[in-house]
Amino acid sequence: MQKSLLAIAMASLLTPVSYLHAQEVQTNDTVVVTANRFEQPLAEVIASTTVISKQEIEETQAKSLLDVLKRVPGIEVSQSGGRGHSASVFIRGFNSNQVLFLVDGVRINSAAGGISFNHIPVGIIERVEVIKGPGGALYGSDAIAGVINVITTSSESSEGSVVSLGAGSDAQKEANFSTTRAFANGGVLKLAGGFEETEGFDIKDPETGLNYGYESQNLFASYSQAFNDEFSGSASVRWYDSLTEYDSGGKNYGYSENLSITADVQYSGSRLSSTLRANQQAIENLDYSQAEGKDNAGTVKKIALTNLQFLNQYLISEGITIGAGADWRKEKLDDDALSYGYPDKLAGESRSTTGVYLSTDLQLGDLQVTGSVRNDKHDTYDNYRTWSLGTRYQITESHSVRATFGTSFKAPSYSDLTNNPDLKPEEAMSREIGYTGEFALFTVDVAAYDNDVDNLIIWYEGSPWWYPENVDATLKGLEITGYFNTWFVHHTVVAEFKDHQDSGGNKLAKRADENYKWLMDASYENFDVNLTYTYTGERLGNPKEVSDPKNELPSVSLWDASVGYWISPDLVVRARVDNLTNEKYQTTLSYNAPERRYFANLTYQF
């Protein structure tokens, strides 16, 4: 019934009324850096790619990176509660930890566990680039499902400052600021910071009578300097900490702190472009009960990460580009690491990886071909070789077809190996074909994909503990995205159909077979309005070898809305309502999702 209502609503909009061309699809001036690790026009990227701009993030009033990502075609989000609680981001049905997560091109994934999508403050984000499909031949381990790159810097050097204050349901409060200053010598300084706190709500099912809150603080500073027309450099520091309340036989606390320092030097000549980048991260994760307290936390993990990159791209001639580069990464778990009050089995362990890659991009008239090969020397799993090949043919100015093929791998995490030291690395073979067509009234993109995964790591519910195992799996799907305008309203409509199962024929948990999205964005005079509809089909709650009705999450339809009113060119007031129809639902078994929530925000720029 819910899907029928959506179809009726869509049909009502497709009456012949003053259509505009769907301008948002892939604008010619949009530039991305993730697809080949250097800037290139989005129109020249073969892989399925979505770019979310700062303007879109602000207008939709996204409170977290999860709010940004759940609007992206092909992405499904699952969360164990509300703001700040653990979450998974599934790209085309792949595991959340099979996504390579970058901030300004630097890897954030840690072998100590999963990715925290909650800890990147949206206030410092300039744009988010999502590349779907294997990225192992350029980036190495973890990029099986794709790459998410959060960009916090901008090529624009315009000056300005922004201050925003917000409040909402569950006693949520937030404040953020940012300022950018451009200097006559070619330098650009950016400073930002903010805090957020909420009392939360009772996330457990059955309910415990307790609220589980969240609080965080963040600071960010960057400075870039153009030395001349060819050489430039930059340095940045990013810090955040957070405290999350969660349930584990009573109220428990998860504390995280992250410090990241990055510096790079870039050369951009008429033919050669090069980047030398270094990054150091210090990560601390604590888990403790009320009785233990923070100073006596039972689980303590401190991780030191070092990343070095040397990237090069050379234009041989018009339409022929080659790339080459090397990455070195080292990760060390502290000698005093604890797990549930006992010394961690992998305390003091370190792992390092050295990767080298070659790539090429050929433009042969209407035919474009890209390819890359990479070798990663892992100190535990020896050498892994990956490759990718992509091609696109421009049939006419408005119609094109594409195909991509590639391999990728992911090494087990520290947590995986602690619970099963015999685990093997995951390996995947991915295939995709696609079509993009621009018509008078709309633009459509269709992608069909087929992925085979060997040694997929799945955590199963055991007694008394969960445990990981290697299984083989296949993930197939069809992704259809349409763009069109009615008057001043821009529409994005997404339909996703997935077939995902392990070698025993069992569905993979938390992934629906069907997902639908309808995004409506409008700007009229002083108003910005956004309306989002998402439908998520039935799915398993936890991995099981046999079907169990108690293990199924029912389908759900959700509406979110936001509106902004510009009081003056410098002052805007915004309001947002999540879960307009107040649906009661879960995206993780035994964890309640938020009911209807209200937020308001006042932003002043000067």
UniProtKB/Swiss-Prot annotation:
An individual GO BP term: monoatomic ion transport
Q: Which Pfam family would be a valid example here? A: Plug
Give the superkingdom in one word. Answer: Bacteria
Signal peptide start-end: 1-22
One Gene Ontology term, aspect cellular component: pore complex
Compartments in which it is found: Cell outer membrane
Supply one GO molecular-function term. ABC-type vitamin B12 transporter activity
Q: Where is the TBDR beta-barrel domain?
A: 158-606
Which membrane topology term applies here? Multi-pass membrane protein
Q: Name the residue ranges of motif: TonB C-terminal box.
A: 589-606
Outline the extent of the TBDR plug domain.
41-153
* Principal subcellular localisation of the protein: membrane
State the function annotated in the UniProt record: Involved in the active translocation of vitamin B12 (cyanocobalamin) across the outer membrane to the periplasmic space. It derives its energy for transport by interacting with the trans-periplasmic membrane protein TonB.
Q: Which HAMAP family match?
A: BtuB
Q: Which PANTHER family match?
A: COLICIN I RECEPTOR-RELATED, TONB-DEPENDENT OUTER MEMBRANE RECEPTOR
Q: What's the family? A: Belongs to the TonB-dependent receptor family. BtuB (TC 1.B.14.3.1) subfamily.
Q: What's the name of the protein?
A: Vitamin B12 transporter BtuB
- Lineage of the native species? Bacteria, Pseudomonadati, Pseudomonadota, Gammaproteobacteria, Vibrionales
Q: What is the gene called?
A: btuB
